[in-house]
A protein has these predicted regions:
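Aromatic-anchored, charged helix-turn/loop surface patch used as a conserved interaction hotspot
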Residues: 1-70, 78
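Serine/threonine-rich low-complexity intrinsically disordered regions
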Residues: 3, 41, 53, 86, ...
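A general "mature secreted/periplasmic domain" signal
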Residues: 8-11, 17-21, 83-90, 97-100, ...
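Residue-level signal for secondary-structure boundary elements
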Residues: 19, 23-26, 70-73, 82, ...
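Short, surface-exposed, charged/polar-biased interaction segments
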Residues: 28, 32-35, 39, 79-86, ...
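Amphipathic protein-protein interaction modules
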Residues: 59-108
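Helix-rich interaction surfaces within compact, conserved domain-sized segments
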Residues: 97-135
Length: 135
């Protein structure tokens, strides 16, 4: 059985690999991430149509968890983002993200900020004495 801490480590690793693939795809299509994309530019259109295989792997990994484990992961992430207690985040997110698809989508949307969010969220949970696998 994978613990929440182990899952977060794996999620972070998958996200870092996905970020490298994003950079490679941007480079292949001549996109300068500092300048952003012109939505209607043919290079930007081609780039948006590319699939990041590592994003797919991350989504598959997340979908392999039950919803309660995903809620813990999501709550830790949002606690690190918002600075609110992890348990409060979990309870609030349960209302606004009622389905597993909602939870996976919102976790995926924060991929570029995982390291900072999870670092702060894990530190806060530790300071609050929260058991990551049972809260």
């Amino acid at each position: 059985m994978t613990t929440v801490a182990q899952a977060i480590d794996r999620i972070r690793g998958l996200a870092q690999t996905a970020a490298r693939v994003d950079a490679e795809l941007d480079k292949r299509h001549g996109i300068d991430p500092k300048l952003g994309m012109n939505y209607f530019d043919p290079k930007s259109i081609a780039r948006r149509q590319e699939t990041n295989s590592e994003d797919v792997k991350l989504a598959q990994y997340l979908n392999g968890f039950d919803i309660e484990t995903l809620r813990r992961i999501e709550a830790l992430m949002y606690s690190g983002r918002n600075g609110t207690p992890t348990i409060d985040e979990r309870d609030d997110l349960r209302k606004t993200h009622p389905t597993k698809d909602d939870v996976v989508r919102t976790i995926m949307e924060k991929r570029v900020s995982f390291d900072a969010y999870f670092d702060r969220g894990l530190d806060r949970a530790k300071a609050d004495g929260i058991d990551l696998d049972t809260f």
